[in-house]
Amino acid sequence: MVVNKPPMGWNSWNTYAEKIDEALILESARALKESGLADAGYNYVVIDDCWALHERGKDGKLVPDPEKFPRGMKALADEIHALGLKFGMYSCSGLMTCARYPSSLDREWTDAQTFAEWGVDFLKYDYCYKPLNRRGEELYRAMQLALANSGREILLSACSWGADKTHEWIRSTGSGMWRSTGD
């Protein structure tokens, strides 16, 4: 998916890191709306790392932490969409996420379908713990292909921090945008 202008919005990581939950995300979404930022184009609400349990479900799917997100991601997405905003989530192309939760490596199709079912509009896809025997280009292309076939338009944000000469290969992956530097 390609967009005409860069998406703008709010991401939970820099302010809250792993200290996130449904109430905080909804409070932040409402603040975008009530402050007028949404009217100025800031319409993405993105949950970063640490939203899942440390193990996948028996069906192989990612599972939201029920203590943090008791109603699940679909209900949260529906509420964010009702505010006229877009819902974003986080996953990782490496062996695990940066905070050591389950990643989407080799589970791209399952996770893309799950994200689509939950109503996700944006996926921040990180680069932590990348297997040494896999190329970044391959990892991002796999997720983009899975998202493109999920039945829902989901913008892929490749968060590779400019590692591995990202600028030389990222366009070929179909990613809608990419991060060019580290924190």
Functional labels for PLM-detected ranges:
Residues 1-4, 37-40, 80-82, 116-117, ...:
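Extracellular/periplasmic catalytic domains that process cell-envelope and extracellular macromolecules
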Residues 1-13, 45:
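N-terminal hydrophobic targeting/anchoring segments and the immediately downstream early-domain regions
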Residues 4, 19-22, 26, 70, ...:
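Conserved structured core elements
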Residues 12-20, 64-66, 130:
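Second-shell loop/turn segments in exported
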Residues 28-132:
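Aromatic-lined carbohydrate-binding/catalytic grooves of carbohydrate-active enzymes
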Residues 102-106, 138-141, 171-172:
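Short low-complexity, flexible loop/linker segments enriched in glycine and/or proline
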Residues 107-110, 152-183:
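Glycan-recognition surfaces
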Residues 113, 118, 130-145, 158:
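Active-site and adjacent substrate-binding regions of carbohydrate-active enzymes
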